[in-house]
Amino acid sequence: MRSYFEKPRSTVGWKGLINDPYLDDSFKISEGLKIARKLLLEISEIGLPLATEALDPITPQYLQDLISWSAIGARTTESQTHREMASGLSCAIGFKNGTDGSLEVAINAMQSAVAPHRFLGINPSGQVSIIHTRGNPDVHVVLRGGSNGPNYEKEAVLKSEQQLQGKGLDPSIMIDCSHANSNKDHKNQSKVLDNISEQIREGNESITGVMIESNIGPGNQSISDKLEYGISITDACVGWDLSLIHI
């Protein structure tokens, strides 16, 4: 289950449950971490693996033992800090292509993350330490489209396979049905998923997963004093009924 607690922003805005859990600019981060961990534990107890976005390099020491898969977002895939962090995370990592649609930054990130690194970080006791990582072999690319348009269709997937193989990387591809692939319209996620399903029926073996932005109710809402339960306050999502059909 996609359980994102940190929100990267193009400029400013609500940065997620960990950063501001009460949506009131009180920024009670210590409480946000506890709430996030409690939710992860509850979801784990019903047997669902958990996926999140690795954004703040400190956060994984508090949550990583409950995470099965992490994304490195389009804005941070090019960041050395996030590549180093990914090299030491104990889960599979999906690197998104750049916001311009380029796959090169994700490929470079994958090559970096599979290698060992040394960098400053915190240890499990919260002390500043020199971190030594072994490299993470479980990395792959996430196609999310870009400023030049979507990249989920057959031709784009084939090109991605060729680029990955050309660099000696496993052509394991996850496709993000949202963001630029949906033209930022949550209703288009069904169209994207239909196209992906057809590619798999035709014999594609490189597509190993999809990402769907879903919530209890469809759409989204602005942060206010009167929030409707189960409706996203960030990106627009498909509702739960449609999510079940997608699955």
Task: Please provide the spans of the model-predicted regions.
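Active-site-facing alpha/beta catalytic cores
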Residues: M1-Y152, A156-V157, H179-A180, K184, ...
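Conserved active-site beta-strand-loop modules that form the wall/rim of enzyme catalytic pockets
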Residues: V139-H140, P171-I173
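Redox- and metal-dependent alpha/beta enzyme cores, enriched for Fe-S-associated oxidoreductases
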Residues: S160-K167
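Short helix-terminating capping/connector loops at secondary-structure junctions
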Residues: K167-D170, N204-S206
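Conserved, mostly hydrophobic/aromatic
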Residues: I175, G239
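Short helix/strand-capping connector loops at secondary-structure junctions
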Residues: Q221-T234
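Conserved small/polar residues in nucleotide/adenosyl-binding loops
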Residues: I245-I247
